[in-house]
Amino acid sequence: SAASLADMVAGTRRGLLLTCLWYIREVDPETLLLTGLTRDGVYLVENGEVVAEVDHNFRFNHSPLDIVRQATEVGATERTLPREWKDWFTRVAMPPMRVPELNMSSVSPSR
């Protein structure tokens, strides 16, 4: 069976846990390049434990196809919560993924 998110965190030596992606926009429809931001949900993981909230948001520029190709682990599919409570239509089911080389293009303070 697929790993839970907790199992995946427990198996992480050092990394970032991203729990919310926001303001996702299309950059190049031919390659499906998207840009977006992390928001209110970036955590530092060290030695299998979430040790701190990261006080920054990050911008990414990636194709979801490339992200799936780069994933080294995919966990059990879970129903996600909407960013805003009134956004009931944006609920989806998605698995957590480990993507070791996911690069962020810029950083900004989260507050």
What is each model feature region?
Residues 1-111:
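Dual-mode signal for accessory low-complexity, basic/Gly-rich regions
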